[in-house]
A protein has these predicted regions:
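N-terminal binding-site loop/beta-alpha segment at the start of enzyme catalytic domains
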Residues: 2-135, 178, 193, 199
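Twin-arginine (Tat) signal peptide motif
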Residues: 10-19, 357-360, 420-426
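Acidic (Asp/Glu)-rich catalytic clusters
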Residues: 61-63, 124-132, 159-164, 220-225, ...
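Short, acidic/polar
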Residues: 86-100, 148-161, 212-220, 292-295
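Active-site groove signature of glycoside hydrolases
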Residues: 162-180
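Beta/alpha (TIM)-barrel catalytic core signal, keyed to glycine-rich beta->alpha loops juxtaposed to Asp/Glu
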Residues: 175-374, 381-403, 428-429, 433-438
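Short Fe-S-cluster ligation motifs
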Residues: 384-423, 452-455
Length: 455
């Protein structure tokens, strides 16, 4: 064990002090950017950015100097549809990736299924212009693989798509059920194959991304495998939520001194447009800090977090997030506690815990699951969900009108919730463990009830 890690484990210190002992801030000359389209986020973003390079974190297991901000390559801008139906809008995506690289982002996370297989090629196309030892590329073995031969073919294709000879970080993707892991990775021998690829040097660090329960997590860590890192969902809203267990997962990894890669730090964007009461709490503490910065800094303020992935879809997201991690300073313990209080305030409302990952898609009956949940949650975030049991005053009528108009404009008639027959093929795919037909029924009943009152 390194002296640095021994100190972190053995010396009493605050969470902020522990992080400062591991973070290396790297500052360089300013890098400008011309203005682009109006930000989608509700808070003002300075497109030019403040310049400088994002701070680095040293991986104590192998010495990698990894940017605290990692580029999640699942939410690139698209044309002709969304991430499932459209294709990557290549020029703005290239500009975003190049800007991030120039600002010091050196960790790029892609996967077989992202953008229907086009993410890997897009990332490889951009990164090939840079020295191979100047960035870290992460890819994943998809759940779609069923046999060892399929896994070998997929791995070879991934290297080819990305235009590289090795992956710096490679993951068993989206582990959520023990029998699935046993069938593919143990019975089919795919885990041993990946370990062999690691011995050959085509995988430098091997880990897994996780979406299951605590028992499965402990079982995975108990396997006779030397995992190099683990990727978990982590955000301030779910941290102390017993149904989400993210705090317990992090603590188990910290006990084993395993580097943590964070996914969904902004919860699929749902921690951007916060309820007004929560926004007020945070702004009273720091009027200049955006909701995205609060979410990203929360995750990076834990000492065993190596990098925080953000699935950025607009240039202003990239600029803002790079600014957040330039000359990075962790949140204070008081600010961490403020976020815990904010989470309690947030949970006083009811929201559908969808992160818009699209893993549930496509629906065999063409229900636009993500679009329905997105519309419902946006009304919730804007505090515009109508309550049919409340007084039918002007405010209720306004909320009813907003919900029905948004539902009509954002969800096509042949993709609405009433088309769900409850086959439940979608729920096992959901990383948030949602029972999707139940949530669709909830939306359908609300929409239908206020629609009947409209007549």
């Amino acid at each position: 064990m390194s002296d640095q890690k021994k100190n972190i484990l053995s010396t009493p210190m605050t969470r902020a002090e522990a992080l400062r002992s591991m973070v290396a801030g790297v500052v360089a000359g300013a890098f400008g950017l011309s203005a682009c389209s109006e930000p989608k986020r509700t808070e003002q973003v300075t497109i030019a950015g403040k310049g400088g390079r994002v701070s680095l974190k040293r991986n104590p297991r192998n010495g990698d100097e990894v940017s605290l901000l990692g580029f999640g390559c699942m939410r690139f801008p698209t044309v002709g549809g969304d991430r499932y139906t459209g294709r990557i809008d290549r020029e703005p995506t290239r500009e975003m990736l190049e800007y991030a690289y120039e600002r010091g982002v050196n960790y790029y996370d892609t996967a077989w299924m992202y953008h229907r297989g086009d993410s890997e090629g897009m990332v490889g196309e951009v990164l090939k212009q840079y020295p191979r030892d100047s960035f870290f590329l992460a890819d994943k073995m998809p759940p779609e693989a069923k046999t060892l031969e399929q896994a070998k073919e997929i791995f070879a294709t991934q290297l080819q798509r990305c235009g590289v000879e090795y992956f710096d970080y490679y993951l068993c993707h989206s582990i959520s059920r023990q029998y699935v892991f046993q069938n593919l990775y143990l019975n089919e021998g795919v885990l041993e194959y990946l370990l062999e690829e690691k011995r050959r040097g085509r995988i430098r660090q091997l880990g897994f991304s996780f979406h299951g329960d605590l028992a499965l997590f402990e079982w995975l860590l108990a396997l006779p495998v030397e995992w190099d890192f683990v990727q978990i969902q982590m955000n301030w809203l779910d941290w102390r939520d017993e149904t989400r267990i993210s705090e317990k997962l992090y603590n188990l990894l910290a006990e084993r001194e395993l580097p943590v890669i964070v996914m969904e730090p902004i919860r699929g964007g749902s921690l951007i447009d916060l309820p007004q009461s929560v926004t007020t709490m945070l702004r009273e503490n720091d009027p200049a800090m955006t909701a995205a910065a609060w979410a990203l800094k929360f995750c990076a303020s834990y000492p065993y977090v190596l990098t925080v992935l953000s699935g950025m879809s607009r240039m202003e997201h990239v600029v803002e997030n790079c600014d957040t991690f330039t000359d990075f300073q962790p949140l204070s313990d008081e600010q961490i506690e403020l976020l815990h209080r904010a989470a309690e305030q947030y949970r006083n409302n009811t929201r559908i815990d969808c992160t818009d990952c699209l893993y549930c898609m496509p629906c065999p009956y063409e229900v636009d699951i993500a679009g329905i949940f997105r519309t419902y949650n946006r009304c919730f975030d804007d505090q515009l969900l109508p309550n049919p049991d409340s007084a039918h005053d002007e405010e209720y009528l306004r909320r009813r009108r907003v919900l029905l108009n948004r539902y009509k404009n954002n969800v096509k008639p042949d993709g609405r919730a009433e088309r769900c027959i409850g086959c439940n093929q979608c729920s096992p795919k959901c990383p948030q463990s949602l029972h999707i037909p139940t949530e669709l029924k909830r939306v359908e009943e609300l929409v239908e009830r206020v629609r009947q009152e409209w007549k």
